[in-house]
Amino acid sequence: MEKEMRNLMLLVLLTVILDNGIGKCNAKSEEDQDGNARNNRIDKNDDNSDSIEKYLREVTDELSKILAKRIYRDIQLRENNKKAENRQSWIGDLENLDIDSTVQRPPGLWGREADFDNTRAHDSAQISDEKQSGLWVGDAKPPGLWGRDAKPPGLWGRDAKPPGLWGRDAKPPGLWGRDAKPPGLWGRDAKPPGLWGRDAKPPGLWGRDAKPPGLWGGDAKPPGLWGRDAKPPGLWGRDAKPPGLWGRDAKPPGLWGRDAKPPGLWGRDAKPPGLWGRDTKPPGLWGRDAKPPGLWGRDAKPPSLWSKDNNVIKSRSDDAKPPGLWGRQVEDGPTKIWGDGFLDAERHIRLLKNDERFNRLEKKADMEEELRVAQGPSVTNAKDTFGELADLLRKRIVKRLHKNDSLNNRRNNKKNNKF
C-alpha cells in the first residue's frame, strides 16, 4: 500500500511539472513567433497538453481504484485476523478454565451470566445444602440447562464453532452442510470412491442403460448406493419422513439439517410427545418460553403457591411466588439456591442462613420466640420478624424483576439493531 501511495504522489508531481513546462513553452512561442505561427504553435501545444492531461487523469483514476481496493482488502484482512484472534482467545479461555478462581464455574458450564460463589462446584463434598444441582435461580446456568447466551459444551449459539456441532457454514468432520464433501457422506456433485454422481465414470462400471449385478442406472435405488433423490437409511432430506421421527420437517437421529428436530432438542414450534405448557417444554432442555417441572415462567401456576400477602402456602394464587420457584420475573435469594421443585417457608429460610441480614433476622425471631414462650402467647414479635423476612425477600424479587426486564430490553434492542 505504501508503494502505491508513493507512485500516486509521483504522478501528481509529474502532472504539476508538465503543466509548468507547457505554460513556459507557450509563453516563449508567443514572444518569438509571429501571429500565425504563434497561433498554430499554441493550438498544437494545447492539443498536446490536453492529451497529456487526459492520459494522466486516466492513469490516476485507475491507480486510485486499485489503491481503494487494496485498502479495503487490507481492512477486511485485519478484521478477519482480529476475529480469528478473538475466537482463538475464547477457545484458549475455555481450555484453560480455572474452576478454583474467584468466580467459580462448574466444569462443562460457561455463560455470560453464570455466577457462582467461592464454593468449588466440582467437589461434591463441598457442595452445601443450597447447592443441589438440577435447578438454578436467576441468571445461573447449570449443566443441562442453558439460557439464550450460554455456551455449554456440545451446544452453541449462531456463530460459535465448537468441536462436534457447527452452524450453517461450518464444515466439521462427520457433519457437513450443503456443499461440503466429507469422506463417507456426499452431496449432489461429490465424487467419493465407490459412489458416483450422474456423469461420473468410475473404473469397472458399465454403460448408461446396462444393468450389471449390484449396480443400477436410471432411477433405481440399490442398497448402499444412492443418487440425488434416494433416501438411504439413517440419512433423510428436508421433506423425507423416516419411521420413528417427528417434527415439522425431517428429523433423523444423529444428523440434523437446518429445520431438523432431533430427539431431546426441539424448536419453538415443535411439539414432541410428553411435553407440556404454552409453547415448547421438553424435559431436560428448555427454550426461551419453556416451562420445565419445578420451574415456572410468568403465566405458569404450579400447585401450592405462596400467598403474596400473608406468606402462607396456599393453593393457586394469581400473583403467588413460592420459595424455591424461579421464573422469568422471580428473584433468587441473596445466595444461589438449588433445589428440585418449590420449598416450604421454613426450609427456604434455613437455606438462606449464610446471608447476614437473614441470619440476623432469624436469630432475632428465635430470641423473640423464646421470649414469647416464656412470657405467654400475647407476644407477637416473632410473627412480625418473619413478616419482615418475607418483605425483604419480596423486595429482592421486585428488584430482580426490574433488572431482568432491563436486561431483556437491551438484548432485544441489540438483536434488532443487527438486522
Curated annotation (Swiss-Prot):
The protein's name: LWamide neuropeptides
Keyword Repeat belongs to the record: yes
Species, as recorded: Hydractinia echinata (Snail fur)
Tissue: In planula larvae, expressed in a narrow ring of ectodermal neurosensory cells around the widest circumference at the anterior of the larvae. In primary polyps, expression is confined to endodermal cells of the hypostome. In mature polyps, expression is strong in the epidermis from the tentacle level to the base of the polyp and weak in the gastrodermal cells in the apical hypostome.
Region listing for Disordered, in residue ranges: 27-48, 120-332
Annotated family: Belongs to the LWamide neuropeptide family.
GO cellular component: extracellular region
Regions of compositional bias (Basic and acidic residues) in chain numbering: 120-132
